[in-house]
Amino acid sequence: MPDIWFDMDGTIADLYGVENWLPMLRAENPAPYVAAAPLLKMQPLARKLNQLIARGYTVNIISWTSRGGSENYNNEVREAKLKWLKIHLSSVQFSEIHIVPYGTPKENFGTGILFDDEQKNRESWNGIAFDEKNIMEKLREL
Protein backbone atom coordinates (compact mmCIF):
# COMPACT_ATOMS: atom_id res chain seq x y z
CA MET A 1 0.00 0.00 0.00
CA PRO A 2 1.33 3.46 -0.79
CA ASP A 3 2.05 6.15 1.74
CA ILE A 4 -0.38 9.05 2.00
CA TRP A 5 1.12 12.47 2.74
CA PHE A 6 -0.63 15.68 3.72
CA ASP A 7 0.60 19.24 3.63
CA MET A 8 -1.07 21.35 6.30
CA ASP A 9 -1.30 25.09 5.48
CA GLY A 10 -3.83 25.65 2.72
CA THR A 11 -4.52 21.92 2.42
CA ILE A 12 -6.12 20.78 5.68
CA ALA A 13 -5.59 23.92 7.82
CA ASP A 14 -6.91 27.32 6.75
CA LEU A 15 -3.87 29.35 7.80
CA TYR A 16 -4.60 31.95 5.12
CA GLY A 17 -8.10 32.47 6.51
CA VAL A 18 -6.82 33.60 9.91
CA GLU A 19 -7.28 37.35 10.28
CA ASN A 20 -3.93 39.17 10.06
CA TRP A 21 -2.07 35.90 9.53
CA LEU A 22 0.74 37.44 7.45
CA PRO A 23 1.61 40.31 9.83
CA MET A 24 1.55 37.81 12.71
CA LEU A 25 3.91 35.44 10.88
CA ARG A 26 6.25 38.31 10.02
CA ALA A 27 6.25 39.24 13.73
CA GLU A 28 7.13 35.59 14.48
CA ASN A 29 3.85 34.93 16.26
CA PRO A 30 2.91 31.22 15.93
CA ALA A 31 -0.73 31.77 16.97
CA PRO A 32 -2.20 31.58 13.42
CA TYR A 33 -0.94 28.02 13.06
CA VAL A 34 -3.00 26.91 16.05
CA ALA A 35 -5.97 29.19 15.27
CA ALA A 36 -6.35 27.99 11.67
CA ALA A 37 -9.74 26.43 11.05
CA PRO A 38 -9.92 23.03 9.40
CA LEU A 39 -10.51 23.17 5.64
CA LEU A 40 -12.66 20.06 5.71
CA LYS A 41 -14.73 18.16 8.24
CA MET A 42 -12.20 16.54 10.53
CA GLN A 43 -14.37 13.76 11.95
CA PRO A 44 -15.06 12.14 8.56
CA LEU A 45 -11.43 12.71 7.54
CA ALA A 46 -10.13 11.04 10.71
CA ARG A 47 -12.53 8.13 10.27
CA LYS A 48 -11.42 7.62 6.65
CA LEU A 49 -7.73 7.90 7.51
CA ASN A 50 -8.11 5.35 10.30
CA GLN A 51 -9.89 2.99 7.87
CA LEU A 52 -7.01 3.37 5.41
CA ILE A 53 -4.44 2.75 8.16
CA ALA A 54 -6.33 -0.44 9.10
CA ARG A 55 -6.03 -1.52 5.44
CA GLY A 56 -2.26 -1.04 5.49
CA TYR A 57 -1.74 2.52 4.29
CA THR A 58 0.57 4.83 6.19
CA VAL A 59 -0.61 8.38 6.79
CA ASN A 60 1.98 11.13 7.15
CA ILE A 61 2.42 14.89 7.40
CA ILE A 62 4.95 16.93 5.41
CA SER A 63 4.65 20.65 6.08
CA TRP A 64 6.88 23.71 6.05
CA THR A 65 7.69 26.15 8.81
CA SER A 66 7.32 29.87 8.18
CA ARG A 67 9.20 31.51 5.34
CA GLY A 68 12.20 33.41 6.70
CA GLY A 69 11.53 32.40 10.29
CA SER A 70 14.30 32.26 12.86
CA GLU A 71 15.33 28.89 14.27
CA ASN A 72 13.49 29.65 17.51
CA TYR A 73 10.35 30.70 15.65
CA ASN A 74 10.46 27.62 13.43
CA ASN A 75 10.58 25.48 16.57
CA GLU A 76 7.50 27.33 17.86
CA VAL A 77 5.77 26.76 14.51
CA ARG A 78 6.54 23.03 14.73
CA GLU A 79 4.99 22.91 18.19
CA ALA A 80 1.95 24.89 17.01
CA LYS A 81 1.38 22.54 14.08
CA LEU A 82 1.70 19.48 16.30
CA LYS A 83 -0.85 21.07 18.64
CA TRP A 84 -3.19 21.68 15.68
CA LEU A 85 -2.94 18.02 14.68
CA LYS A 86 -3.59 16.92 18.28
CA ILE A 87 -6.67 19.16 18.46
CA HIS A 88 -8.17 18.27 15.08
CA LEU A 89 -6.91 14.77 14.24
CA SER A 90 -6.06 13.27 17.62
CA SER A 91 -7.39 9.81 16.74
CA VAL A 92 -5.10 9.44 13.72
CA GLN A 93 -1.81 7.64 14.32
CA PHE A 94 0.50 9.34 11.83
CA SER A 95 3.48 7.21 10.80
CA GLU A 96 5.68 10.23 10.16
CA ILE A 97 5.35 13.95 10.82
CA HIS A 98 7.92 16.17 9.15
CA ILE A 99 7.64 19.91 9.77
CA VAL A 100 10.65 21.21 7.90
CA PRO A 101 12.14 24.59 6.96
CA TYR A 102 10.23 26.52 4.32
CA GLY A 103 11.17 25.49 0.80
CA THR A 104 12.66 22.11 1.71
CA PRO A 105 11.89 19.73 -1.19
CA LYS A 106 9.04 17.58 0.05
CA GLU A 107 9.91 14.81 -2.40
CA ASN A 108 12.98 14.09 -0.24
CA PHE A 109 10.72 12.68 2.47
CA GLY A 110 8.60 10.10 0.74
CA THR A 111 6.65 8.70 -2.15
CA GLY A 112 3.08 7.64 -2.71
CA ILE A 113 0.16 10.04 -2.62
CA LEU A 114 0.54 13.72 -1.73
CA PHE A 115 -2.20 16.25 -0.99
CA ASP A 116 -0.73 19.76 -1.27
CA ASP A 117 -2.11 23.14 -2.32
CA GLU A 118 1.20 24.21 -3.92
CA GLN A 119 1.53 23.23 -7.56
CA LYS A 120 5.35 23.20 -7.42
CA ASN A 121 5.26 20.57 -4.67
CA ARG A 122 2.80 18.44 -6.61
CA GLU A 123 4.89 18.65 -9.79
CA SER A 124 8.11 17.55 -8.07
CA TRP A 125 6.52 14.80 -5.97
CA ASN A 126 7.66 11.16 -6.43
CA GLY A 127 4.24 9.62 -6.92
CA ILE A 128 0.68 10.79 -7.37
CA ALA A 129 -0.19 14.30 -6.18
CA PHE A 130 -3.51 16.05 -5.73
CA ASP A 131 -4.43 19.59 -4.76
CA GLU A 132 -6.50 20.46 -1.70
CA LYS A 133 -9.82 20.15 -3.53
CA ASN A 134 -11.83 16.94 -3.19
CA ILE A 135 -9.58 15.27 -0.62
CA MET A 136 -12.36 13.05 0.72
CA GLU A 137 -13.42 11.97 -2.76
CA LYS A 138 -9.84 11.00 -3.63
CA LEU A 139 -9.45 9.07 -0.37
CA ARG A 140 -12.70 7.19 -1.01
CA GLU A 141 -11.25 5.98 -4.32
CA LEU A 142 -8.41 4.16 -2.54
Located regions from the model:
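Alpha-helical substrate-recognition element adjacent to the catalytic core
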Residues: 3-88
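Conserved beta-strand termini and adjacent loop/short-helix elements that scaffold enzyme active sites
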Residues: 62, 99-102, 130-132
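Structural alpha-beta junctions
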Residues: 53-56, 86-96, 126-130
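The start of beta-strands in P-loop NTPase/AAA+ ATPase cores
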Residues: 2-4, 111-112
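Acidic, Mg2+-coordinating phosphoryl-transfer loop and its flanking beta/alpha structural elements
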Residues: 112-142
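Surface-exposed, flexible loop/turn segments at secondary-structure boundaries
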Residues: 67, 105, 135
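Short, flexible active-site-adjacent loop segments at beta-strand->alpha-helix junctions, enriched
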Residues: 65, 103, 118-119
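Donor nucleotide-activated moiety binding/catalytic core segment of transferases
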Residues: 92-112
